[in-house]
């Protein structure tokens, strides 16, 4: 059993990885997620955030909770490892097109992590920050993203 306040939940895109040019694919109607995820392995790390998570790894269990699809799990795991980041990786099913505000809390619940075990969440996306906070979690917004 994990003790209370021993888990840090970390988003990936925009929080520890620079999304960059591929963000344009989410601004189309409908969003083109295939193209968006196709080049995620090229993302540059956000150095300050990667360094922070590396330090947190010594004190907390890290759970990466991302909106990325399972189809890019290998690439995502390689990217995390290359940047010295380790922890559980929660990803959405390939055909799940629901908004992150629905998917991410569900992923976390399905993983067995209890809300009281979470010390805080690192997130960039405004809608997710609001969602995490509505669940009673402390959420540190590391950047402002509205997509």
Name each model-derived stretch.
Residues 2-3, 59, 111-118:
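Glycine-rich phosphate-binding loop signature in dinucleotide/nucleotide-binding domains
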Residues 2-98:
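Alpha-helical substrate-recognition element adjacent to the catalytic core
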Residues 16, 68, 81, 104, ...:
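Residue-level signal for functionally critical sites in structured catalytic/ligand-binding pockets
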Residues 44-48, 97-103, 120-129:
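Low-complexity, flexible helical/coil segments
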Residues 53-57, 112, 133:
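Surface-exposed amphipathic alpha-helices with a cationic face
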Residues 76-83, 106-111, 131-136:
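Short, aromatic/basic amphipathic alpha-helical patches
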Residues 99-115:
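Donor nucleotide-activated moiety binding/catalytic core segment of transferases
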Residues 108, 116-147:
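Acidic, Mg2+-coordinating phosphoryl-transfer loop and its flanking beta/alpha structural elements
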